[in-house]
Amino acid sequence: MRPAAALVLLTLGLAACAPQAGKAINKDQLDEAVGAAIGDPNTCVVLASRSGKTVVYEFGNYLTCTHPWPDCAGGKRTARDFLNQTIGKAEATRESCASLEDGSRGVAWSAGPTPDPDLAYAAAMEGPNVPPGVVIADKLKAAFEKAGL
């Protein structure tokens, strides 16, 4: 067998084994819908397969999505940490608390299933005027539906 043909077969075989998460996601459409709903410099939204093994979408900059914010229980976590903690739950999880001791800034968390049964999400938003996690959940549900999930 020619090396090029072997490489093509190997690539196709590996691609067939890769996990798939529902239908294709239109990143531009989802960026627009999420940005309009809860867009903020300190917002991170992560979508993953319900198995939690494949992140299929991330909204927000690297620093926001990797920064550990207060978890409202005395610890800290990132949006991906929150996703991993809530991925198997059937109901949405919503939390809100102060992110600074003086209460001048807050953090809100929301995670749960999306309208696409194969996907779950987690979101974190931090800032001086952050809406509660329940509001973020409602706005994201509408954004996901608008984007075709």
Question: What positions do the PLM features span?
Answer:
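Sec-dependent bacterial lipoprotein signal peptides
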Residues: 1-15
